[in-house]
């Protein structure tokens, strides 16, 4: 009985590791065709196994997931800078603007230009209704980059129970691997914009910096946060104010954003007195 349970856990760990590999590979290569046989070869499974594993993990087909990721990445790019439809299409893996526009309309029901105008109007409405000040103070810094170990959460950003479970698992993993030190930094990677993506499909990586080599194991993966120039905003108080701050940044951003990963760093965190919490948001800039 114990052997059977151990085998089941081992198989589950292998599957979780493969899911991490696929999701990270897709995220880094949305500009490519992303053929099924290539992805299956990368994780050493058949195409049929790949589709089955990923449907179970994503609660949607792999084809639907990739198509959705391409379009949602395009929205991010459109918010970053103005570009031709031809350039935008190629950046998210479409051969021509016609195919891209058709896929975009299938997902959102309107054209890319109409959608981005509607999104901007919606964000401005959020900021006005919150009564938030338009002026934002940002420090400019050059970030050296970090090696991270992560655990992924699918679902509504900041939902108490899954986040608490994930962070506790991450802390235990760090301790088990003797990777928790006084220099460990705690990072949050939000891959999706809840103003664009359904809240239950948002991907969050709870991360910790590591100095030593960590082998990806089960649900724990590794990722590198790239070096570069960032505008850094500070939130004092509960993390529940993060989305309001992100909306304010989107509407009142005074820098030229570059393609890169925005991230959060949790400088101090207390559940019993959240007013003393300090969170920094790093926005990649040119």
Question: What does each of the following model-derived ranges do?
Answer:
Residues 1-9, 37-58:
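Basic, low-complexity segments
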Residues 1-21, 57-61, 68:
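Short, Lys/Arg-enriched, Trp-marked, Pro/Gly-tolerant hinge/linker segments that flank
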Residues 24, 48-53, 60-64, 68, ...:
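A solvent-exposed interaction/effector surface
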Residues 28-32, 80:
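Short helix-capping/hinge SLiMs at alpha-helix to coil transitions
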Residues 33-35, 84:
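Residues at or immediately flanking beta-strands
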């Amino acid at each position: 009985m114990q052997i059977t349970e151990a085998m089941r856990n081992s198989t589950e760990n292998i599957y979780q590791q493969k899911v991490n590999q696929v999701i990270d590979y897709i995220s880094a290569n949305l500009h490519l065709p992303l053929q099924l046989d290539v992805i299956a070869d990368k994780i050493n499974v058949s195409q049929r196994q790949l589709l089955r594993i990923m449907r179970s993990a994503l609660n949607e087909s792999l084809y639907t997931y990739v198509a959705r990721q391409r379009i949602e990445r395009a929205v991010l790019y459109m918010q970053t800078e103005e570009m031709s439809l031809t350039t935008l299409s190629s950046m998210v893996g479409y051969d021509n603007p016609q195919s891209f526009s058709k896929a975009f309309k299938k997902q959102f029901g309107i054209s890319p230009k109409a959608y981005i105008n509607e999104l901007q109007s919606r964000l401005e409405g959020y900021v006005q209704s919150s009564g938030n000040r338009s002026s934002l103070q940002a420090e400019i810094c050059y970030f050296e980059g970090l090696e991270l170990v992560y655990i992924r959460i699918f679902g509504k950003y900041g939902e108490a129970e899954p986040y608490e479970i994930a962070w506790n698992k991450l802390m235990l993993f760090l301790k088990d691997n003797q990777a928790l030190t006084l220099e460990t930094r705690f990072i949050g990677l939000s891959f999706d914009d809840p103003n664009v993506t359904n809240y239950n499909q948002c991907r969050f990586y709870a991360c910790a910096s590591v100095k030593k080599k960590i082998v990806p194991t089960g649900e724990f993966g590794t990722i590198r946060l790239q070096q570069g120039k960032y505008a850094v905003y500070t939130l004092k108080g509960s993390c529940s104010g993060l989305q309001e701050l992100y909306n304010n940044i989107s509407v009142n951003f005074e820098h030229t954003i570059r393609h890169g990963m925005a991230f959060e760093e949790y400088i101090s965190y207390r559940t019993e007195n959240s007013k003393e919490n300090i969170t920094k948001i790093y926005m990649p800039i040119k």
